[in-house]
């Protein structure tokens, strides 16, 4: 028999569907797909100031997005929602203007028009990620997102699965470099805005595209 879904009894909150969809699209990809690490398969929804903070990590990537003014939880409260359920929420949001969220003790329900998505919350403590986020940034890179995506895709063609892409940053310049032994070398230079000392860092290209 199909399981019966109880009507949510907690108070409901109405949010901007566009703001929630935008935040979820940025955060959900960082959640883990490994069911052996159940806590990391969830997205934390937490009270942050007068708004809502979305956080996900698979221990390699960390994504944090604040939705200002989207008050859902009381100060200090947080819940952990399965990322798979939130993927369905993203699909259901479509062009909707509003979404109603009900957070119970064990369940979360999203109402979008005539669609209702209900999921069990994940029990457990989400990792303390705050120490990983610096309070100040010594270096700041500003780059056109679409141009960066296309450049990473081109350079990635030369990178094997385990080969990272180097990002070499200097004044108003970014060079993407991939070197694979016995295969070859690929690089591409972009005009950007960079503030700070020269810096070279390396990323898994798939994570960078996410």
Across the structure, where does each feature detected by a protein language model lie?
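Structural preference for solvent-exposed beta-strand-turn elements
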Residues: 1-210
């Amino acid at each position: 028999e199909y399981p019966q879904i109880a009507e949510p009894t907690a108070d409901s909150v109405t949010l901007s569907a566009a703001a929630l969809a935008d935040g979820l699209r940025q955060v959900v990809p960082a959640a883990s797909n490994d069911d052996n690490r159940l806590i990391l398969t969830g997205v934390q929804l937490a009270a942050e100031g007068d708004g809502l903070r979305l956080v996900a990590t698979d221990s390699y990537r960390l994504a944090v997005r604040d939705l200002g003014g989207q008050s859902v939880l009381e100060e200090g409260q947080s819940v952990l929602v399965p990322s798979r359920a939130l993927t369905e929420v993203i699909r259901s949001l479509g062009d909707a203007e509003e979404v109603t969220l009900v957070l119970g003790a064990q369940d979360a329900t999203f109402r979008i028009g005539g669609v209702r998505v209900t999921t069990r919350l994940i029990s457990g403590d989400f990792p303390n990620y705050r120490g990983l986020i610096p309070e100040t940034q010594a270096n700041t890179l500003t780059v056109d997102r679409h141009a960066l995506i296309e450049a990473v895709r081109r350079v990635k063609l030369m990178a094997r699965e385990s080969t990272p892409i180097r990002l070499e940053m200097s004044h108003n310049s970014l060079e993407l470099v991939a070197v694979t032994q016995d295969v070859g070398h690929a690089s591409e230079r972009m005009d950007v805005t960079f503030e700070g000392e020269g810096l070279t860092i390396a990323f898994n290209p798939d994570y960078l595209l996410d």
